């Protein structure tokens, strides 16, 4: 592997936190990626140096389960995340309450809402509602960058939430073909409804 002879930034003097240890080290950054971690004298020269003396240095943190519908919007959520040291949020994408908004339409609307107000990076995780228009627009939503989805075999009393086996299998095939991931709540909606009514 080639070693960079020059990087954009070096963060020095702090305690670097990795997944396995905390150590005195410097971090070399090129573009938006960590190029090297180690003693400063072994790192390439940089255009900019940041003094982290007395501080902990961590890579950007990711919150992969965020709800930003209701009181919080994307701008406020991003501001709170940045203050907390998060650099990426993966909120649940939501559908318009009126009409039959497709998954593609929801993705485009949310991309517009995030727009330039975002101080952090965003990814999205969508619940695949039990509506033909959602499944039909799934491949296009994946082409637009959404790769994480959730489905439910329960919540029978919530419109469009509970999915039958055929719908789930079709969605799983489509998500796999597009290189995505799908989380499934596997409780039995019929048994839960029976127990709720008992």
Positions of PLM-derived features:
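Histidine-rich, glycine-flanked metal-binding segment
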Residues: 2-58
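Divalent metal-coordination and catalytic microenvironments
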Residues: 14, 27, 32, 54, ...
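Conserved protein kinase catalytic core
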Residues: 19, 59, 69-71, 97, ...
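Short, well-ordered amphipathic alpha-helical segments that serve as non-catalytic structural scaffolds
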Residues: 41, 77-80
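Redox-cofactor binding/interface segments in oxidoreductases and associated redox assembly factors
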Residues: 51, 63, 69, 91, ...
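Di-metal (Zn2+ and/or Mg2+/Mn2+) metal-binding site signature of metallo-dependent hydrolases
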Residues: 55-78
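Divalent-metal coordination cores built from histidine and acidic residues
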Residues: 79-195
């Amino acid at each position: 592997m080639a070693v960079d002879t020059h990087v954009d930034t070096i963060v020095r003097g702090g305690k670097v936190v990795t997944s396995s240890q905390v150590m005195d080290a410097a971090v070399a950054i090129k573009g938006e990626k960590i190029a090297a971690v180690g003693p400063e004298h072994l790192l390439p020269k940089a255009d900019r140096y940041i003094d982290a003396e007395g501080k902990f240095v961590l890579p950007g943190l990711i919150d992969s389960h965020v709800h930003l519908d209701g009181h919080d919007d994307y701008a406020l959520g991003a501001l709170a995340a940045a203050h907390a040291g998060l650099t990426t949020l993966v909120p649940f994408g939501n559908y318009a309450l009126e009409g039959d908004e497709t998954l593609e339409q929801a993705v485009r609307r949310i991309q517009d809402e995030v727009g330039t107000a975002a101080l952090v990076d965003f990814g999205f995780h969508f619940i695949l509602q039990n509506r033909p228009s959602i499944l039909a627009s799934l491949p296009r939503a994946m082409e637009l960058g959404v790769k994480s989805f959730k489905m439910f075999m329960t919540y029978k009393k919530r419109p469009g939430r509970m999915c039958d086996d055929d719908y789930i299998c079709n969605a799983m095939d489509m998500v796999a073909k597009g290189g995505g991931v799908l989380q499934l709540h596997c409780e039995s909606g019929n048994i839960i409804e029976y127990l709720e009514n008992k």
